[in-house]
UniProtKB/Swiss-Prot annotation:
Microtubule inner protein component of sperm flagellar doublet microtubules. The keyword Magnesium does not apply. Transmembrane segments: none annotated. SMART domains: DM10 (SM00676). Keywords: Cell projection, Cilium, Coiled coil, Cytoplasm, Cytoskeleton, Flagellum, Repeat. It comes from the Eukaryota. The keyword Repeat applies. This is EF-hand domain-containing family member C2. It comes from Bos taurus.
């Protein structure tokens, strides 16, 4: 009842075309065993490896049982011994039930040792030779037969004990391996023997392999100032841990007058008590060779004897790593060398090996002598001051080397000019020169200044270059002197400053946009352009906060919460009583300014474009649209703005660069794409005329032309004064 398996096993088959019984180990119907049948296990049952369980070769990977065993090996035809006890290690690999027997190496045994039985599955002794050893056949204090040899297992390791206990094997108490009687007798004889030739080994291979390329480094000094023409010599001592040798190098200062030697002391063992004198060959050796030998051949002498009593041997002590420490004075062939400091590796070595924690260094350098200031003759007046100085340094005059790094860093490239431009007026008592306007340019690459006067018609002045590009000295300095003159620096230029340029006094009234932005970005060099410092200065006038709000409110008649720049500057200057400069007022105004439209309205641009197209009688818009359709491969009716600009230039569209760029930016979408049909339809002045608008022509002029005959332009138009009052005084509306 309840059976679901009824198949019958195949018991008969063919082997080499011969009918024979092949199902001795197969069960009967439904997997049940036949009467009297016992299935012989092929492998250990731990683990079973059925279903989702891990197989044995995965679960027991790299897990080995280790047993200690011995074997009584009979020794025939020998009177000294009848048998010999041979020890073995039996390894049972759990992953595949293989066994390996290994015999440990015994010195001077005369037996072939090592692997006694290679790793494989070993069958049980007869009559069960058709089965193999499994983990359940091993235990302590039992006999195991491998190929007719009986191994007596007397112990195992801790892992084997724990494993056998976990799988349910009851371990027997461990036994002891009997001592080999012959080895015992031989050991007793060796202990009482005194060899004629001493067996002393001087093995330095371990030290070499452990400390190769590891060197202790000490910084030391040899004070030889007591001798004639002697002085303090700085040295570096290298102690090689691989062979206990010492090497010393000398650190020669610049222009010391001494010959540059590669080594102060060649690498060798350094004796403690030196110089010890001159010894004969063979006196300082590890072993003494007696003057007897058994013969010689063409290659070597053989049959020599060593003196085991070491009579007459000279012992010489050498410096070791334990003798070296900071503050110790060592003897280097009669020279007293003081160890002053060491490197980090040396400190770690002594801290790890000897537990030393005190590594206080000793100053090894002598106090530097007072520096003699070199005096140069005064400036002669010929050439520049740098050229005169270079002619005094050496016999062969060399040109002055400019600061090339600064030149590369601040040279103009692209749209970045690295030039600070200020607009100034001449401070003079002459009425004709009061209204003259100048442009002062400061070049950051070489700290030079140029002054330009814009050309104004009917002014009586030719204009043009007022001062060519040159470095400008500060006034009040002596001309013929040995020191370099001081020149005007960029930090001294700001709006509201007075600059003396070769006797002409200029008042800086304004600066261009690039200069103001540069000064605000580098507020550490230009503190007057730092909004934080200016706000902090305004907070000191907190007592005038109410008055300041009343003045701004009175100036804002339309209640727009903003005032123009001239009104703002006048209010700030009057209330702070001259504590703020024009540069600081501009910094505040630029921070709280009302944003302006970056470009004119699109209709204004289209009207100006129509005016230029009419003057040039350009009407070829259909051809432009056809070219755009040809370029539009995907038929989306949009093209990138750069492609439309290229087509306009190839068709000679009579619009200047600035106006065309502004038109394209006004028609492009967020992806920089332009609908070319709507763009050229808007430019078609025949089909879509636009009324003429009275606006200023959208042409970017040079700053010199824009300033010609005009007062100083304002940096911003309107300022939000309420935002300023909130940030400075916390005043609400």
């Amino acid at each position: 009842m309840g059976k679901e398996k009824f198949h019958k096993s195949q018991h008969w088959g063919f082997c080499n075309n011969v009918r024979m019984l092949v199902g001795e180990d197969k069960p009967g119907i439904g997997g049940e065993l036949l009467f009297g049948q016992k299935i012989k296990p092929k492998y250990s049952v731990f683990p079973k490896g059925m279903g989702t369980d891990s197989p044995s070769w995965v679960a027991f990977d790299k897990q080995v049982l280790s047993f200690d065993a011995y074997l009584e090996d009979e020794v025939p035809d020998k009177s000294q011994e009848n048998y010999r006890i041979r020890r073995y290690k039996i390894y049972f690999y759990l992953e595949d039930d293989t066994v390996e027997v290994n015999e440990p190496v015994l010195q001077n045994s005369g037996l072939p040792q090592g692997i006694f039985i290679r790793r494989h599955r070993i069958s049980l002794p007869p009559p069960n030779e058709d089965q193999f050893y499994t983990v359940h056949h091993f235990n302590v204090n039992t006999d195991i037969v491998f190929y007719g040899r009986t191994f007596k297992v007397y112990d195992c390791d801790a892992f084997t004990k724990n494993f056998l206990t976990k799988i349910g094997v009851k371990l027997n108490p461990p036994g002891q391996c009997p001592e080999d009687p012959y080895m015992k007798t031989r050991r007793e004889k060796l202990d009482c023997m005194e060899p004629i030739c001493p067996y002393e080994s001087f093995d330095t291979l371990k030290q070499f392999l452990e400390y190769d390329r590891k060197v202790l480094r000490f910084f030391c000094v040899w004070d030889d100032s007591g001798s004639v023409f002697g002085d303090r010599r700085e040295l570096i001592l290298h102690y090689f841990l691989s062979d206990d040798t010492i090497e010393i190098k000398e650190v020669l200062p610049h222009n010391s007058g001494r010959d540059a030697m590669s080594l102060f002391l060649q690498r060798r063992k350094l004796p403690k008590y030196g110089p010890p004198g001159v010894y004969q060959p063979g006196q300082l050796t590890d072993q003494t060779v007696l003057n007897v030998y058994g013969g010689y051949s063409e290659t070597r002498v053989y049959g020599f004897l060593l003196d085991k009593y070491q009579l007459g041997k000279l012992d010489q002590e050498f410096y070791k790593d334990t003798d070296l420490s900071i503050g110790t004075t060592i003897n280097v062939w009669g020279r007293k060398v003081l160890l002053c400091d060491c490197d980090d590796f040396t400190k770690t070595y002594y801290r790890t090996k000897y537990g030393i924690e005190n590594f206080t260094s000793i100053p090894c350098k002598a106090p530097s002598p007072p520096k003699i200031e070199r005096k140069f003759p005064p400036y002669t007046g010929f050439g520049s001051e740098e050229d005169s100085l270079r002619s005094c340094i050496g016999l062969m005059p060399t040109p002055h080397q400019r600061n090339f790094k600064k030149f590369i860093e601040f040279d103009s490239y692209g749209n970045i000019s690295n030039t600070l431009r200020f607009f100034a007026k001449l401070i003079t008592h002459k009425c004709a020169d009061v209204e003259r306007m100048f442009v002062i340019s400061y070049f950051l690459s070489d700290d030079t200044i140029s002054v330009f006067e814009p050309i104004e018609r009917n002014s009586g002045y030719t204009g043009g270059m007022f001062l060519k590009r040159v470095r400008v000295k500060k006034p009040g300095q002596e001309v013929f002197k040995s020191e370099f003159s001081e020149y005007i620096k960029a930090e001294e230029l700001y709006v509201g400053a007075k600059v003396n340029v070769n006797g002409y006094l200029f008042f800086l009234v304004n600066a261009d946009e690039y200069t103001l932005n540069y000064m605000e970005r580098n507020s550490d060099k230009f503190p007057l352009s730092s909004i934080e410092l200016v706000i902090q200065k305004l907070k000191e006038e907190e007592c005038k906060s109410r008055e300041l709000k009343q003045v701004f409110t009175a100036a804002d008649c339309m209640h727009t919460k903003m005032v123009d720049f001239n009104t703002f500057r006048e209010i700030m200057m009057n209330l702070t009583v001259g504590k703020l400069t024009d540069q600081e007022v501009i910094t505040i105004a630029r921070r709280y300014r009302v944003p302006e439209d970056p470009c004119p309205h699109r209709n204004v641009l289209v009207a100006q474009a129509h005016e230029q197209l009419k003057k040039n009688a350009f009407e070829n818009f259909e051809r432009l649209i056809a070219m755009c359709v040809y370029e539009d491969r995907e038929k989306k009716k949009v093209l990138p703005s750069k492609d439309i600009k290229r087509l306009c230039k190839s068709s000679r569209l009579p619009l200047n660069e600035d106006l065309l760029g502004s038109l394209l930016s006004g028609f492009e979408d967020s992806e920089k794409q332009i609908n070319y049909e709507s763009f050229f339809c808007a430019l078609n002045w025949r089909v879509n005329p636009v009324p003429v608008l009275e606006v200023a022509s959208y042409i970017k002029e040079r700053c010199e032309d824009e300033w010609l005959g005009m007062p100083s332009p304002i940096p911003v138009k309107y300022i939000y004064y309420l935002n300023l009052l909130k940030d400075v005084f916390g005043v609400d509306e």
